[in-house]
């Protein structure tokens, strides 16, 4: 279980209030699919994923990215129980979708990069560290059913 300090919780909550869930979610998922093309196999119903521009402009990628970041928003409201928050999604991704749990870590890292790009100098090392801790905790919670 990940333990967040009061300062880390405040940093994450403050940053999250400024995140554009739709835009950043779509960009993060799109970048994941471009940079790690083997992850595309989990999205075969999304239509054209043949190029970076097709992926980044794909409405299904954008919609699912928004859904992913909305789930992360729920986790931020429940930072003390990430495992419980993601129990159902962990089961779904493990038992039904058979997603490699390493992909959760990859997406988290891509999300941190997207946030750093969007926030620029405002994205301090302290903010990055708190975000990395958060996405690592979420990745671990999502991988829980695999163990």
UniProtKB/Swiss-Prot annotation:
| Keyword Heme appears in the UniProt entry | yes
Question: Which CDD domains does this chain map to?
Answer: Hb-beta-like (cd08925)
Biological processes, Gene Ontology terms: hydrogen peroxide catabolic process
SUPFAM superfamilies per the UniProt record, alphabetical: Globin-like (SSF46458)
What keywords is this UniProt entry annotated with?
Heme, Iron, Metal-binding, Oxygen transport, Transport
Q: InterPro entries, per this entry?
A: Globin, Globin-like_sf, Globin/Proto, Hemoglobin_b, Hemoglobin_oxygen_transport
One term under GO cellular component: haptoglobin-hemoglobin complex
Residues recorded as binding heme b, renumbered to this chain, are 64, 93
Q: Which PROSITE patterns match?
A: GLOBIN
Q: Which parts of the sequence belong to the Globin domain? A: 3-147
Q: Name one GO molecular function term.
A: organic acid binding
Q: In which tissues is it expressed?
A: Red blood cells.
> What function does this protein fulfil?
Gamma chains make up the fetal hemoglobin F, in combination with alpha chains.
Task: State the family named in the UniProt similarity comment for this chain.
Answer: Belongs to the globin family.
Its subunit composition reads:
Heterotetramer of two alpha chains and two gamma chains in fetal hemoglobin (Hb F).
Report what the protein is called: Hemoglobin subunit gamma
Species for this entry? Otolemur crassicaudatus
* This protein's encoding gene: HBG
């Amino acid at each position: 279980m990940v333990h967040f300090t009061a300062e880390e919780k405040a940093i994450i909550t403050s940053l999250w209030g400024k995140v554009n869930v739709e835009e950043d979610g779509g960009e993060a998922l799109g970048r994941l699919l471009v940079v790690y093309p083997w992850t595309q196999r989990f999205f075969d119903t999304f239509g054209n994923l043949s190029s970076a521009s097709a992926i980044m402009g794909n409405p299904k990628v954008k919609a699912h990215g928004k859904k992913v970041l909305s789930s992360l928003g729920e986790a931020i409201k429940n930072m003390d129980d990430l495992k419980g928050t993601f129990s159902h999604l962990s089961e779904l991704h493990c038992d039904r979708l058979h997603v490699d749990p390493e992909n959760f870590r990859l997406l988290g890292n891509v999300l941190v990069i997207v946030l750093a790009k969007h926030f620029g100098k405002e994205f301090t090392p302290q903010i990055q560290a708190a975000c990395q801790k958060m996405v690592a905790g979420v990745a671990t919670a999502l991988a829980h059913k695999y163990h």
